[in-house]
Structures are given as structure tokens and as C-alpha cells.
């Protein structure tokens, strides 16, 4: 190892590689937004209202996810209940 190689900067990814990586992130994000059903926000509000009839919770305690894998759609509902 020479003295000059010790102080040499590590190779940085090219701007094209960085742009490609950023584009992949944007495309993945938009694909996720496109696959989101239109009824999901209303479903979340309706579920929150039903749960509020029995338990006092805020909207941030309810999380709803819809996944579609191979033609099979799944609905995942997570509710954080307060301690009694």
C-alpha cells in the first residue's frame, strides 16, 4: 500500500447510477399508489367510526393495508387499543 493510495478517495457511484436508483424508488412508490383501491380511505373512516362506538381511539391508531399477490387480495387491519 503506497502513501498515495491511503489518501485516495473511494470511488463514488456515477451520476447515472444515482439517477437510476432514484428513478427505481419513484417508480416503486407510484406503483404502490396505483394499486391502492379507491375505497380504502372511506373504508378506514367507516371502520374507525364502528370501533369508536365501543372504544375511544384516534385515527392514527388504525392502520389498513391491502395487498394483492397473484390475484389474491388481502386486507390487513391493525387497531391499537388503549389499556383498560
From Swiss-Prot:
Is-annotated flag, keyword Cell cycle? yes
Q: Which GO terms describe its biological process?
A: cell division; regulation of division septum assembly
Keyword annotations for this protein, in alphabetical order, are: Cell cycle, Cell division
Origin superkingdom: Bacteria
Cysteines joined through disulfide linkages: none
Checking InterPro entries in the record gives: MinE, MinE_sf
Which protein family is it in? Belongs to the MinE family.
Task of the protein: Prevents the cell division inhibition by proteins MinC and MinD at internal division sites while permitting inhibition at polar sites. This ensures cell division at the proper site by restricting the formation of a division septum at the midpoint of the long axis of the cell.
Q: Which HAMAP family does the UniProt record give?
A: MinE
UniProt-recorded name of the protein: Cell division topological specificity factor
What taxonomic ancestry is recorded? Bacteria, Pseudomonadati, Thermodesulfobacteriota, Desulfobulbia, Desulfobulbales
Amino acid at each position: 500500500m503506497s502513501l498515495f493510495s491511503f489518501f485516495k478517495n473511494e470511488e463514488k457511484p456515477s451520476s447515472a447510477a444515482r439517477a437510476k436508483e432514484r428513478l427505481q424508488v419513484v417508480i416503486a412508490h407510484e406503483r404502490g399508489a396505483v394499486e391502492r383501491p379507491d375505497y380504502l380511505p372511506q373504508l378506514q373512516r367507516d371502520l374507525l367510526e364502528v370501533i369508536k362506538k365501543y372504544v375511544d381511539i384516534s385515527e392514527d391508531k388504525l392502520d389498513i393495508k391491502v395487498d394483492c399477490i397473484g390475484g389474491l387480495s388481502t386486507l390487513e387491519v391493525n387497531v391499537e387499543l388503549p389499556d383498560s
